[in-house]
Amino acid sequence: MLSLLYYLVVIAVALVLYVASFIALVVCYPFDRKRVVVHTLSKWITDTIFGLPPFMKREVIGIENIDPKKAYVMTLNHNSMADIITIYNLPLVFKWVSKKEVYRIPIVGRLLYAHGDIVINRASAKEAMQLVHERGKEWLAKGAS
């Protein structure tokens, strides 16, 4: 019963913040080119969804070494959803690089588009690397990691 309640809360929170993200994107886009507002809403989504289960604890060591005024290029060895939870605890606005298949997931895919994340087609490594390089430079120039 508890897991059913958890999933209902997750769905409700995700839907509310999903709608809020798109409203924020439309309203804030002219003056929020880094998409900080949409990023903040996504942080709330992960904090809420992954903060509900009492057995999930988070600890980020070394966070004091990150300068929020700088842009970083980060590489994650994505082994689990814990990577996503952890990176949203960093004091940075960042963009994901994700395979195009992830964008087909309801709600999640639309949020990634709202973020301005980088979509790659893994069928062509050369094109994917070129896209990451071009779009990555654009976002780094705007101050996003």
Regions found by a protein language model. Name each.
Residues 1-59, 110-111:
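A transmembrane-helix-recognition feature enriched in membrane-embedded lipid enzymes
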